[in-house]
Design a protein with these regions (language model features):
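N-terminal maturation segment of proteins
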Residues: 21-188
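Gram-negative bacterial Sec-dependent N-terminal signal peptides
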Residues: 1-23
Length: 188
């Protein structure tokens, strides 16, 4: 659905449910900005759900990249929690709660569980998904998709080197970690 139509529908719903158009528009702008930034920060996931603006890029999983992404998520969480849910339509209230809890879950993974420092397979899956998502679906001419595949493949050695630098305490059985590291060596 085109963004203008979605925004118009959101405004109509807001009027019918008691939220003011300005409040509904502000919330919609916040959500749109959040997802624009999310897709930019996570181009591999963006490709997998059909957003193709960043098909030639891979996620920045470096420590600096993780810090920037975490700060972005905290800013989004602060902005969402600052919105009084009583000013939103029922649907927007639900969307707000879902997004808040999704962000909290991601922050738990990144800041507390720190999977990116424990699971070598994160980097292997990122590398394989980066290419698979481009060739698996026929969303653009093959030549266009192959240009993106080549661009991403050129970034895979850096992605795997980032994983090697980030992993501090491999998670799970040592055979699981060895298997992930072996797969990483085979695709680098």
């Amino acid at each position: 659905m085109p963004m203008k139509l979605m925004t118009g529908a959101a405004l109509a719903a807001a009027v019918l449910t008691g939220a003011t158009p300005a409040e509904a528009q502000s919330f919609q702008n916040l959500v749109t900005t959040f997802y624009d930034n999310e897709f930019r920060a996570h181009p591999i996931a963006a490709t997998s759900i059909g957003v193709h603006d960043y098909d030639a890029e891979v996620d920045d999983l470096s420590r600096d990249g993780q810090a920037k992404d975490t700060a972005r998520l905290h800013r989004a969480l602060d902005a969402l929690t600052a919105i009084d849910p009583a000013t939103l339509s029922a649907g927007d209230r639900d969307d707000r709660e879902i997004l808040i809890n999704s962000i909290k879950g991601t922050l738990l993974d990144v800041e507390t569980i720190r999977y990116w420092q424990k699971d070598p397979d994160v980097y292997v899956r990122s590398a394989t998904s980066a290419v698979f998502n481009l060739v698996h679906r026929d969303f653009a001419p093959l030549a266009d998709r192959l240009r993106s595949v080549i661009a991403r493949e050129r970034q895979i050695p850096m992605l795997l080197a980032t994983g090697k630098a980030n992993i501090e305490h491999p998670r799970g059985r040592s055979s699981t970690s060895r298997s992930a590291m072996s797969r990483a060596r085979s695709i680098s």
